[in-house]
């Protein structure tokens, strides 16, 4: 069988991570999500927390510009991007898999056997879900959703020059709030 890769990009709270894991389980292939962060930690020596958070900040943002300046060379975020690119490319070359987030849709854009999926849902569905799944209590769920989506979009735009969530950048976009998690899994698995 030819290697097949499914990338899952998603709005925060839409269930994309859960969908990716369920698709992988149903197909009997690995799902890479936190494993990408772990591999980047091994390669760079940065802490897991830093690697995870840096994936949501673009160089030149307030936080990163306080610590580095691109005029003097690549930022830590740039270094992490290079490692992320390498790790995702290597995972896709290993064999069939599902890769969740981390701009994998862009990184693997030239891979002919890659299905690029975007999962989204309306604000109410996502707000309820982050309270149920993550126990969100510190700020309003809607505020956290807007913040996370804004960061993901900026990061994606900075490194890929593509508009995150824009339907034309994906083979398939699914509304998990309307279809439900399990139906999204069935649809994606049927296209494998």
Q: Which residues fall in each region the model found?
A:
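Pre-Walker A (Motif I) flank of P-loop NTPase domains
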Residues: 2-11, 95
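Glycine-rich phosphate-binding P-loop
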Residues: 8-24
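Short beta-strand-centered segment that lines the nucleotide-binding/catalytic pocket of NTP-utilizing
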Residues: 30-41
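ATP-dependent small-molecule kinase phosphotransfer cores
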Residues: 41-96
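Small-molecule kinase domains that catalyze NTP-dependent phosphoryl transfer to phosphate-bearing small molecules
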Residues: 59-66, 78, 137-182
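RNA pseudouridine synthases
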Residues: 91, 104-110
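Conserved phosphate-donor/acceptor-positioning beta-strand/loop module used by diverse small-molecule
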Residues: 110-132, 138-148
